[in-house]
Amino acid sequence: MFSTLNALDFQQQFRDSNSCLEYLSEMKWKDGYTCRKCGCLIYTKGYTPFSRRCASCRYDESPTAHTIFHKLKFSILKAFHGVFRYSRKKGMSSYELSKELSISQKTAWLFHRKIQQAMASSGKHPLTGEVHIDEFVTGGPEPIKRGRSLGRKKKSLMMAEVINGKKIGRIYCTKIANYKKETIYPIIQRTVAKDARVVTDEFPTYDKLKEKFKKAKQRRSRNGSAFENLHQQIMNLKGWLRGIHHHCGEHHYQLYLDEFCFRTNRRNREHGIFYSLMTRIASIQSKTFKELTAFAA
């Protein structure tokens, strides 16, 4: 397609709705066409621009069907612009997006959630090599309490590959309900390769981690200096939440963590974050507004 995309490239590449639909069609069927209804591999030109019609059952599928662009309340050109803006270094708030695209706050909020949904980790690529792990909290100040406070702050666990002892590789971050072994250990086991060299601080929760990871070890935090690279990523996350989004509720907190990790993990990609994000968008079916706002009790 093209390498890292800047604003001028974007404007030249996506001039109108047809150029967006053509690109989306190429992304959606880049690995070949298969009819969703009957499995036929042969297609003809569909009813609408860049849609495909099954040669067997005549099922007609548009490029936007089964993607976050399905039944949009605004033009696909605006939607592409929104994806491009969210693929930039820091992204933007839904409030800013609503002003930039001249759409309602509710519509911008929903579109942001759909993009974040596409940014969620696939879970197919465990962290490898040396992996540093630490827990942290986000939110406003609360009264000093003994031990690890379980107040209203949002609790999180970050895991990061550390290359040659100083460079951060891929990261993964998830919200946690508490700091108990039975909560944290399964998350680490799902996210980190078994042969990884897991390094944590001396918090008691991690004292049995060696039973799960043979190369696991604990070291003194020394006020964070022993995990400087990991803590820098945590500070970057906190700064991004405060500076761009100002506030995120408990129910959608994981979506913001996913967005931060997605962007961080693709910072050096040859084709840029926009290409990676569009690849995801073209292959997943988005949730409805009702599904995205269905909070757990």
Regions inferred by a protein language model and the residue ranges of each:
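Residue-level recognition of single "structural anchor" positions
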Residues: M1-A297
